[in-house]
Amino acid sequence: MSVPAEAGKRRDRRRHVLDLDDFSTQEIEEILETAVSMKEVLGRAIKQVPTLRGKTIVNMFFEESTRTRISFELAGKALSANVVNFTARGSSVEKGESLIDTVRTLQALGADMLVMRHSESGAPYLAAQYFHGSVINAGDGRHAHPTQALLDLFTVRQRLGRIEGLKVVIVGDILHSRVARSNLWGFTRMGASVTLCAPQTLIGPESFWKATWPDLTITSNLDECIKDADVIMTLRLQKERMEAGLLPSLREYSRFFAITAERVARAAPHCLVMHPGPMNEGVEIMPDVATSAQSVIEEQVANGVAVRMALLYRLSGE
């Protein structure tokens, strides 16, 4: 069994996926179309094709991860690649080996692709300078998480049939969120209008955002901006990246910015509720909303495998 023929109409000429800032609308469209084919593969009785047989993918996760790491592992194995999971703990990194030397070592061992998550913004970019194969950014510091944005785009298009013209509201810890930044690139590139909603302390200077996205709406009034929204994406409070004093209390934050059933009722009837995970239920989203008919949180997780299969496939040049 093989990948459906329509998935192979075009290969990406790019070697790396570091963020969506330099992706054209056409490139994103083609990835989403390929993901449709990969989702069809995952719906078969045997969820595997031989497309990347003989290729070696190393998942380098320097930060803890459940969804992204397992999703990439499943994606690589569904394409018949050899998948190796690397963690800093127990490796030569603990002995002081640099990222560059680690990348060179993995290259010497025959790795064809590196999937990297790192706490330092820019780490995958550094790796890409020294690795002869492909590097995929699986999240770097506050900077970017391009595959999360692609799976979010895919989920919205699968549910609503389009992205162009939609009103997307991103709520929560914008300041520390790599997901917010990559989704800004993705949704605006695909023609959606985006609103950022957060306390001033969790969004930073408006001029920073407007310099890149001049049409962006920025507000701290969730009850107002959520009206007629097609998509509500709420983000986790990233306490591990926060400085002290950014929030008075979690209770105060939840009062003004939690996604509740009452607030969702203000949005469009077909509005989708999204969360990249992991969730702090009762803080940024109420449990009944997370499991409601409008929630696509589990679909996001499931769609991540198909989208990451599409990226691995297109970058491989097979």
UniProtKB/Swiss-Prot annotation:
<dbReference type="GO" id="GO:0004070">
    <property type="term" value="F:aspartate carbamoyltransferase activity"/>
</dbReference>
<comment type="similarity">
    <text>Belongs to the aspartate/ornithine carbamoyltransferase superfamily. ATCase family.</text>
</comment>
<dbReference type="InterPro" id="IPR006131">
    <property type="entry name" value="Asp_carbamoyltransf_Asp/Orn-bd"/>
</dbReference>
<comment type="pathway">
    <text>Pyrimidine metabolism; UMP biosynthesis via de novo pathway; (S)-dihydroorotate from bicarbonate: step 2/3.</text>
</comment>
<dbReference type="InterPro" id="IPR006132">
    <property type="entry name" value="Asp/Orn_carbamoyltranf_P-bd"/>
</dbReference>
<dbReference type="GO" id="GO:0044205">
    <property type="term" value="P:'de novo' UMP biosynthetic process"/>
</dbReference>
<protein>
    <recommendedName>
        <fullName>Aspartate carbamoyltransferase catalytic subunit</fullName>
        <ecNumber>2.1.3.2</ecNumber>
    </recommendedName>
</protein>
<dbReference type="InterPro" id="IPR006130">
    <property type="entry name" value="Asp/Orn_carbamoylTrfase"/>
</dbReference>
<dbReference type="GO" id="GO:0005829">
    <property type="term" value="C:cytosol"/>
</dbReference>
<feature type="binding site">
    <location>
        <position position="148"/>
    </location>
    <ligand>
        <name>carbamoyl phosphate</name>
    </ligand>
</feature>
<dbReference type="InterPro" id="IPR002082">
    <property type="entry name" value="Asp_carbamoyltransf"/>
</dbReference>
<comment type="function">
    <text>Catalyzes the condensation of carbamoyl phosphate and aspartate to form carbamoyl aspartate and inorganic phosphate, the committed step in the de novo pyrimidine nucleotide biosynthesis pathway.</text>
</comment>
<dbReference type="Pfam" id="PF02729">
    <property type="entry name" value="OTCace_N"/>
</dbReference>
<dbReference type="Pfam" id="PF00185">
    <property type="entry name" value="OTCace"/>
</dbReference>
<feature type="binding site">
    <location>
        <position position="68"/>
    </location>
    <ligand>
        <name>carbamoyl phosphate</name>
    </ligand>
</feature>
<feature type="binding site">
    <location>
        <position position="178"/>
    </location>
    <ligand>
        <name>L-aspartate</name>
    </ligand>
</feature>
<dbReference type="GO" id="GO:0016597">
    <property type="term" value="F:amino acid binding"/>
</dbReference>
<keyword id="KW-0808">Transferase</keyword>
<feature type="binding site">
    <location>
        <position position="145"/>
    </location>
    <ligand>
        <name>carbamoyl phosphate</name>
    </ligand>
</feature>
<keyword id="KW-0665">Pyrimidine biosynthesis</keyword>
<comment type="subunit">
    <text>Heterododecamer (2C3:3R2) of six catalytic PyrB chains organized as two trimers (C3), and six regulatory PyrI chains organized as three dimers (R2).</text>
</comment>
<feature type="binding site">
    <location>
        <position position="277"/>
    </location>
    <ligand>
        <name>carbamoyl phosphate</name>
    </ligand>
</feature>
<feature type="binding site">
    <location>
        <position position="236"/>
    </location>
    <ligand>
        <name>L-aspartate</name>
    </ligand>
</feature>
<dbReference type="GO" id="GO:0006207">
    <property type="term" value="P:'de novo' pyrimidine nucleobase biosynthetic process"/>
</dbReference>
<feature type="binding site">
    <location>
        <position position="95"/>
    </location>
    <ligand>
        <name>L-aspartate</name>
    </ligand>
</feature>
<feature type="binding site">
    <location>
        <position position="67"/>
    </location>
    <ligand>
        <name>carbamoyl phosphate</name>
    </ligand>
</feature>
<dbReference type="GO" id="GO:0006520">
    <property type="term" value="P:amino acid metabolic process"/>
</dbReference>
<feature type="binding site">
    <location>
        <position position="278"/>
    </location>
    <ligand>
        <name>carbamoyl phosphate</name>
    </ligand>
</feature>
<dbReference type="InterPro" id="IPR036901">
    <property type="entry name" value="Asp/Orn_carbamoylTrfase_sf"/>
</dbReference>
<feature type="binding site">
    <location>
        <position position="117"/>
    </location>
    <ligand>
        <name>carbamoyl phosphate</name>
    </ligand>
</feature>
